[in-house]
Amino acid sequence: MVYQPAAGARDLLPLDVAQKRWIEDKLQQVFHRWGYHRIITSTLERMDTLMAGEAIQRQMVIQLQNSEDEELGLRPELTASIARAVVTRMTNLRHPQRLYYNANVFRRIWENRHNRQQEFYQAGVELLGVGGLLANAEVLLLAGNCLTALGLQDWHLILGEAGITRSLLDAFPINLRAKVRSAIAHLDRITIDTLPLTDELRERARIMLDLRGNSTDVLQKVSSLNLDAEQQEAVNNLQSLVELLESGGKFPIILDLSLIQTIDYYTGIVFEIVNNTDSQARVLGRGGRYDQLLGLYHPQGENIPGIGFVLNIEDLYQVLLTTQQLPQETPASDWLVVPENPKAHSAAFAHAQKLRESPDLVRVELDLGGTDIPAIQQYARDRRIAQIAWIKADGSLIIEKVSQ
């Protein structure tokens, strides 16, 4: 019998891990430079925690039960878990809270495909306790900084505003609103043309479909929709954000007020980070503002503003494979320590430990015996080991540099 991973699961071998760590380390350096601190939440959550924001479909969650028959689920995303942790464990800390994560998530994928991946790796940030222009700009600029740190140049940001889009949909009859929303989300003009709408509402829906492009054109189009004071203020805030982002130089933005995320807890800006180089566009990450989500977990229902984004490690990996930046080999050891005979075993362990205690990271292997000198030298060449330390019983040594 050949034992295989469970359907949808996979193993990461040493080179896979080295490449994944390369990406994660680059992102972590950026998060630290922006003053963010790592949070680690439970892989298992109560189902009521995961479902509180009405953002996650129950059938997506891989469910378990504990001994008390309590419904549990493997987290399909991190924001709900972090929201729970912040309002229950971090209430005495001052805002804003700048948090980042690097974790795996699990989603049940209902497709007729064997071994459809169900475990994913993500990295992202949550900026909690503050709203407004500067907080929005910080998170978007941080996302751009992450891509720059990875050496990615051909990307753009698709920026929408859930509050504006939702309020524009309020003009449609309740019984048709969901269909209009779905048609706009899928850029489905045929459905818009066939729904039983008045001429005025049909034209409004068509305009909403076309609210995508450069910021000047989109903001001009949306302003033609007879906005009320609240809607106009949201448009003005969006314009201020775009101007701030673009004032610092090249920040590739496509404004898209038809952008409707499947996650429904977003209340303000929403965005997707899209790679341009593939023949087919690849979404590298997404995020948005969720000023009412934390209130669902707060004991007194107090709303705490929040905004964040997630980057998909697998999608970043696929793009980076084409750039030749990822490690092509696992790290080589610096030393191979070889006891010349059994009496030298103790001295060999002592010398290897001395090398490992260097202030800098030094990778040291110990030869475990059973081979002759030529085989040991060939092993060192095959493993790209830089030096061999031949250890005698009295602790003296001969250093051999290995020619590759």
Swiss-Prot record:
It comes from the Bacteria. The keyword Cytoplasm applies. One of its GO terms (biological process) is L-histidine biosynthetic process. Keywords: Amino-acid biosynthesis, Cytoplasm, Histidine biosynthesis. The keyword Cell wall biogenesis/degradation does not apply. It is found in: Cytoplasm. InterPro entries: aa-tRNA-synth_II (IPR006195), aa-tRNA-synth_II/BPL/LPL (IPR045864), HisRS-like_core (IPR041715), HisRS/HisZ (IPR004516), HisZ (IPR004517). GO terms for molecular function: histidine-tRNA ligase activity. Pathway: Amino-acid biosynthesis; L-histidine biosynthesis; L-histidine from 5-phospho-alpha-D-ribose 1-diphosphate: step 1/9. Belongs to the class-II aminoacyl-tRNA synthetase family. HisZ subfamily. NCBIfam families: hisZ_biosyn_reg, PRK12292.2-3. This is ATP phosphoribosyltransferase regulatory subunit.
